[in-house]
């Protein structure tokens, strides 16, 4: 109701903006508080992660700040991006996260690895680096793993599209990768997870190869943008 009111009053509406840009709203209660502040004539603080391209003019209802800026102790803040950036403890600042699907997971695993082990390691990596699971757009690996039961089960559970590439395609990936002679002997390419993430649309690697219990994971981010027009 409140977000509809912002639209009817020709003010910037967070839910419409999120829908247009395919952003996940992490907390609808905070979204309503943002809309209430805007209806009351207040400017809402907002920040966007540097990887994002901004299209159009920033609406007057928002005041953009840098992540390092100090906020009013009672302020609401919008954070647009894939990573958690909580306000300092005790600051009183509440953060509404708007999350794009811009993360690509590169995954490698030993044959027969259980889905639970894959899920456990992916979850640990995302949590360690503060990356929202809702930001994951797809997972990628080498074509040798196209029908790997554990990988397929994990992706199906979280409704994550799964894409695979031949070793020749992986070899063409541009960038600096964490090579392994053992992996090259096994798969024909020196690195599966990082190269897969880049081949699947990654613009840059956020998390290089991490390995645990036979599972390797890398995280890349695509180019992404938000449109205020």
Question: What does each of the following model-derived ranges do?
Answer:
Residues 1, 8-19, 25-37, 59, ...:
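Cofactor- and metal-binding active-site motifs of prokaryotic enzymes
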Residues 117-124, 134-197, 201-217, 224-229:
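C-terminal non-catalytic interaction/assembly regions of soluble proteins
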